[in-house]
Design a protein with these regions (language model features):
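Metal-dependent nuclease catalytic regions and adjoining charged, substrate-binding loops involved
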Residues: 2-4, 80, 112-113, 128-180
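Metal-dependent nuclease catalytic cores that hydrolyze phosphodiester bonds in DNA/RNA
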Residues: 1-99, 106, 110, 120
Length: 180
């Protein structure tokens, strides 16, 4: 819980950036007030996440060219982006990495084939990878219910949207009251 004597942390979890894009009030309740309710959806998501939440390897500090990387449940931070992220999966070759984020739900029926909050969370993971010396041109959202992988390029518009969401999350936390 964030209080006046306990100012907002320096880093926002990528997951909270997702919540902020989805519903700023929910992000405030969960991140600032520290009130997180476990419901049936959360329990099911945790069950589906059990494999990717097991540590399956670390990212090499200086990957060799052509070295295959497949690391599960990797935590990285990027103070310059004010972000921290737990990636379900980092896969790639050499210094080029693709974050893969698992979602329990179905593939949305929209032109992007993904939810805006999910794209922003994934891009936040890409920004964290970049800040740690990896190349990351895009990511993958895996919608478990549909068993579908969706590639998401990290273009300038998505990067700007992601950084704006991070700034908005911190501004909201500094307000000291939940948004309507």
């Amino acid at each position: 819980m964030i209080t006046e004597s306990n100012a907002a942390p320096d880093l926002a979890p990528a997951r909270m950036v997702n919540e902020y894009v989805y519903c700023p009030r929910l992000a405030y309740i969960e991140w600032v007030q520290g009130d997180f309710a476990v419901n049936a959806d959360v329990a099911e998501g945790s069950f589906r996440h059990r494999v990717v939440d097991q540590e399956g390897g670390a990212l090499p500090e200086r990957p060799e060219e052509g070295e295959k990387i497949h690391a599960r449940s990797v935590w990285l931070s990027a103070p310059e982006e004010r972000l921290t992220a737990k990636m379900d999966l980092g896969e790639g070759e050499g210094a080029l990495l693709t974050p893969v984020d698992y979602k329990r739900g179905a593939l949305p029926e929209n032109p992007e084939r993904s939810w805006p909050a999910d794209r922003v969370q994934l891009c936040a993971q890409g920004l964290v990878l970049r800040a740690n010396g990896y190349g990351s041109l895009g990511g993958v959202l895996y919608y478990a219910e549909s068993k579908t992988r969706v590639e998401v390029p990290f273009d300038e518009d998505l990067i700007e949207e992601t950084r704006s969401a991070v700034a908005g999350l911190f501004a909201m936390a500094a307000e000291g009251k939940p948004p309507p």
